[in-house]
Amino acid sequence: YSISDDIDTHGFTNTYQISSEFGDFTAHSNEMLYKLIQEIMAINELEKFKATPRFAEAVKASALSPFEIMESLIIDPADTVSGLPEDIEKINLDMLEMTSREKNVHDKKHKHDLAKFAAHKRQLAYDLNVDVYSTNKVLQQYLNSVGWATYSSDQAVPVSLEPLDSINFTKDSHRLHNLLRDKTPEQLHKINAKYLTEMGIDKTVIEAFFANPWLTPRYETMVVGELYSQGLKGGLNEYIGLVNTSSSEQDAFFYQNITKLISHYLNNTNESQVSIEIINNFAVLKVRKHYVIPILIDNGYWSEQSAKTINNFERTSRGDGGDVIQILVWISGEV
């Protein structure tokens, strides 16, 4: 792959244009760039595997499958992707979800096979350190074709990659990644709904959370999982409401990483009375008489309005009637 030298910059947020033999891509922010490069590297690993005799043998074995739709996953996975119902495509091609709604699939054994394939695909994505719910259709095509061919022929895929992204620093990150590998979307939904209820989130907020098409099972699980174990004393309902405003994948990715940053701060403080306050669409931690502002430095921009917002916040919180004695800024990212 190659990254264009022509980088559009809005404050600290860079927008990159990436060219590769697998297509052209755009990444907003450095962290999204790492995610995209990881996906391109994963596609390349899968492409190399598809050129091996092992894959050719797997394709022959998969021809014994009773599902015509599965054959298309290997021959022309792009057509399979574009033909999906819209409400299924938005959760990013988990195969159990994708095929269980096909009218002609009723046989229990077939459903069992599809469930096993879904698990195989999640394991493949896990080994490559990519998001199985990614909106990258090229990645999905490769995961589908290689995943089905090797699953149906009972072959392991000898590929793996180390992660590039830098925001995996919380104690819960490894556990949550394992959860995403081991659980179906339905199981993740039940777990996340249970945790949100136990955290005291309003029913209407929970419903909006699960109804947001940009909050895939991955983003839902990372946000809920990072918050659940922290014991925050207030503001969670408002914070989930803020996450619900996500109107793009970039928004969902941003809130996932902000939540990780909040969790990282809480893991490194002994404070027990911490709450979240939403101020001008900023999530701010209130720690006794301190405010802590978590910022992803390469995922924001500075403007005159931003400066006024921060100045007003500082003036009102520290001025007459304010009880704040210190404001801290907790930063992640690079410029």
Model-predicted regions and their roles:
Residues N281-I293:
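Active-site beta-strand-loop-beta-strand hairpin of nuclease catalytic cores
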Residues L296-V335:
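Catalytic cores of nucleic-acid endonucleases
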